[in-house]
């Protein structure tokens, strides 16, 4: 099995180091990851300047670009073969509920899925530096073997969130659906020494609806959450209702 690894925390992040260590035990690994942190860039592509890549050691490439750039460049240029699987992570911080739409980690898995390659995004549920990246990476390695053996449904990729706990304390994985975040929309408005306004977003504490069966419900109780995500964003249940509208 040959696996391409990437992330959005950067090529030197502890989560990626843990993933390299654990996944290398079950597969041949090549890393193509951003040269710096690219958190919350979602599915962005670099289109207005050239990408640059550097081999920093054997089978590890650093790219001046986004996670989606890394998947594209890895599969279409840097690798001499088509990987069996792409794993993105281990992200420092949860990627659950509506936050998956912002995530560069999840978007890298989406990009691989668009190319027809099975993919897994894996994140460590922590609001600090994170301690148990290796436990999360071990979960990803085990799941990689299962996915390689069984395959994934068409246009589907897996979003895995692992509580920041020692491996022996983790509860069994649960298959979950995407949860719902409660948004407060607080903006921090400041004035710099030259009298100009500047702003910080994303500074409030995160809160989520505690709904059984969701990713948040699982990880908040110590379970590993595995959510199958789909490329098709259509709300199929609403189509017939919208067809009944008198459209202009």
Swiss-Prot record:
Its cofactor is a divalent metal cation. Signal peptide: none annotated. It catalyses: a ribonucleoside 5'-phosphate + H2O = a ribonucleoside + phosphate. Binds 1 divalent metal cation per subunit. InterPro entries: SurE, SurE-like_Pase/nucleotidase, SurE-like_sf. It is an enzyme of class 3 (hydrolase). Its EC number is 3.1.3.5. GO terms for cellular component: cytoplasm. Keywords: Cytoplasm, Hydrolase, Metal-binding, Nucleotide-binding. Nucleotidase that shows phosphatase activity on nucleoside 5'-monophosphates. PANTHER family: 5'-NUCLEOTIDASE SURE, 5'_3'-NUCLEOTIDASE SURE. This is 5'-nucleotidase SurE. It comes from Geobacter sp. (strain M21). The gene is surE.
């Amino acid at each position: 099995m040959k696996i391409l690894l990437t992330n959005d925390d950067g090529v030197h992040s502890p989560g990626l180091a843990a993933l390299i260590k654990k996944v290398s035990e079950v597969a041949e690994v090549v890393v193509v990851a951003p040269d710096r942190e690219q958190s919350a860039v979602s599915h962005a592509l670099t289109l207005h300047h050239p990408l640059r890549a550097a081999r920093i050691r054997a089978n590890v490439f650093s790219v001046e670009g986004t996670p989606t750039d890394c998947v594209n460049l890895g599969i279409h240029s840097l690798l001499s073969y088509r990987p069996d699987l792409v794993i993105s992570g281990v992200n420092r911080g949860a990627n659950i509920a509506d936050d998956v739409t912002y995530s560069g980690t999840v978007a890298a898995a989406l990009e691989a899925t668009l190319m027809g390659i099975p993919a897994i995004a894996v994140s460590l549920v922590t609001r600090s530096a994170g301690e148990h990246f290796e436990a999360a990476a071990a979960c990803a390695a085990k799941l990689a073997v299962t996915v390689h053996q069984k395959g994934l449904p068409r246009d589907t990729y897996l979003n895995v969130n692992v509580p920041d706990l020692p491996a022996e304390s983790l509860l069994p994985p649960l298959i979950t659906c995407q949860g719902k975040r409660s948004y407060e929309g607080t903006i921090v408005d400041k004035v710099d020494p030259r009298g100009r306004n500047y702003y910080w977003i994303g500074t409030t504490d995160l809160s989520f609806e505690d709904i059984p069966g969701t990713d948040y419900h699982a990880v908040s109780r110590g379970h590993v959450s595995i959510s199958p995500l789909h490329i098709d964003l259509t709300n199929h249940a609403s189509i017939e209702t919208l067809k009944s509208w008198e459209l202009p």
